Curated annotation (Swiss-Prot):
Organism: Bos taurus (Bovine)
A cellular component term, taken from the record's GO annotations: endoplasmic reticulum
Species classification: Eukaryota, Metazoa, Chordata, Craniata, Vertebrata
UniProt cross-references to CDD domains, sorted A to Z: LFG_like (cd10428)
Identification of the protein by name: Protein lifeguard 2
Keywords, alphabetical: Apoptosis, Cell membrane, Glycoprotein, Membrane, Postsynaptic cell membrane, Synapse, Transmembrane, Transmembrane helix
Pfam families: Bax1-I
Protein task: Antiapoptotic protein which protects cells uniquely from Fas-induced apoptosis. Regulates Fas-mediated apoptosis in neurons by interfering with caspase-8 activation. Plays a role in cerebellar development by affecting cerebellar size, internal granular layer (IGL) thickness, and Purkinje cell (PC) development.
Gene from which the chain derives: FAIM2
């Protein structure tokens, strides 16, 4: 009887398997042996093979597509996922080549847009016959505004035309020409010195904000709520200004509105710049180069127009 009561540790390696195969059931000891320590369980020293199950592997036993490395995914920055957005992505920005190509493409398109707009502004500012014509025919202004609004809604809200060549470039070209006409006509009402001054200030501000956005560790993409509140403040201030300004109730309200608008769109420029970078709470998909160029272009144009309202001097 004594010999029949073997401890679990003294069993032969094949004994338990033979008992299970024969359908026999053997009583376990009344007092089980103490479990091994962590070092014993992981090292395997002092234990017979088969006494305890093997230690789990270090890699999770999930399929590779179900595992997301938080260090390689921009959507896991700040400790929580960002959700599924149409414009945003969980694309890994570790591939520096893809990132550089995307940013280069956005800024190439942006440079062409700004050069076209600068040419139209210069034409409407320095060429007196053109300036007189556009001021005498305001219908072209409203037609350009309608084209601008329609193309902007199409590019901003419809991912199909925005992502497919050549429709995205055609729509962006029409959008840029209409916005350039609006900006040029607005500039024609100011003297040349004011326009050049505002162009210089806009260039310095935009360059400084862009460099700062690339260098700083502060995440502007996590401040969407603050930017939305500021944008709504700017919107309702514009409505109040449109009502009060014709009656000259508050003469300085226009300057306050211009300062607020320039500040809000400067923050939006930092926000849209960091969307291109990755390594932030939100980032644009590499397919959204048209959307990225569109946003930054609008930010720069709005900053310029608000500076014109703030520093510009009307033509006599």
């Amino acid at each position: 009887m004594t010999q029949g009561k073997l401890s679990v540790a003294n069993k032969a390696p094949g004994t338990e398997g033979q008992q299970q195969a024969n359908g026999e059931k053997k009583e376990t000891p009344a007092v089980p042996s103490a479990p091994p320590s962590y070092e014993e369980a992981t090292s395997g020293e002092g234990l017979k093979a088969g006494a305890f199950p093997p230690a789990p592997s270090a890699v999770p036993l999930h399929p590779s597509w179900a595992y997301v490395d938080p260090n390689s995914s921009s959507s896991y920055e700040s400790g929580f996922p960002t959700g599924d957005h149409e414009f945003f992505t969980t694309f890994s920005w570790d591939d520096q080549k893809v990132r550089r190509v995307f940013i280069r493409k956005v800024y190439t398109i942006l440079l062409i847009q700004l050069l076209v707009t600068l040419g139209v502004v210069a034409l409407f500012t320095f060429c007196d016959p053109v300036k007189d014509y556009v001021q005498a025919n305001p219908g072209w202004y409203w037609a350009s505004y309608a084209v601008f609004f329609a193309t902007y809604l199409t590019l901003a809200c419809c991912s199909g035309p925005r992502r497919h060549f050549p429709w995205n470039l055609i729509l962006l070209t029409i959008f840029t020409l209409s916005m350039a006409y609006l900006t040029g006509m607005l500039s024609s009402y100011y003297n040349t010195t004011s326009v050049l001054l505002c162009l210089s200030i806009t260039a310095l501000v935009c360059l400084s904000v862009t460099v700062f956005s690339f260098q700083t560790k502060f995440d502007f993409t996590s401040c969407q709520g603050v930017l939305f509140v500021l944008l709504m403040t700017l919107f309702f201030s514009g409505l109040i200004l449109a009502i009060l300004l014709p009656f000259q109730y508050v003469p300085w309200l226009h300057a306050v509105y211009a300062v607020l608008g320039a500040g809000v769109f400067t923050l939006f420029l930092a926000f849209d710049t960091q969307l291109l970078m990755g390594s932030r709470r939100h980032s644009l998909s590499p397919e959204e180069y048209i959307f990225g160029a569109l946003n930054i272009y609008l930010d720069i144009i709005y900053i310029f127009t608000f500076f014109l309202q703030l520093f510009g001097t009307n033509r006599e």
